[in-house]
Amino acid sequence: RDRHVAEPDGAPSRLAAPERWPESERLEDWAMGAAMRRGRDIVASHAVVGEAAAASRLGAFVSGKIADYKAARDLPDEDGTSSLSENLTTGEIGPRTCWHAGLRARDEGKAGAETFLKELVWREFAYHLMHHTPRLVTGNWREEWDAFPWREDRRLAEVRAWERGRTGIPFVDA
């Protein structure tokens, strides 16, 4: 709270090409079945990518859904998140841009802005931890927790029901 976060830098005026481009694979060489190729067409209508799309998504969020963000973000049947995760992950928008948009929304009295800012800080904190402690990606914070005595008996009725999507809890079984 009350920490200074620098304004986002503008786009660089020039980017140098790498000395050697990385190897790449052609999707056609993956020998995927027809069902997988069909999936591409289904996903394409939902994948809105690029910096302009990310900026538009952020603008729509802070002018609308941010007001209910505190409660709606936790409800799976509500469209209550910022939907910016993929844009942040791919670098189409930066956390500083989101931070300053959140600050402006908070200053305008939008109810969910403070929660949005906190969630953004938690996201960046988690990435910071993973960068400086890479084992967290596949292990526990404390290594002794790796020996936790989980109930792994596959004969348990609960495990079998979960594996088959038959727990009786619609959200879990979906």
Where are these regions (language model features)?
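Glycine/tryptophan-enriched, flexible segments
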Residues: R1-E144
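Conserved oxyanion/phosphate-binding beta-strand-loop segments in alpha/beta enzyme cores
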Residues: G139-R151, A157-E163
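Helix-hairpin-helix/helix-loop-helix acidic hairpins
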Residues: R160, R164-A174
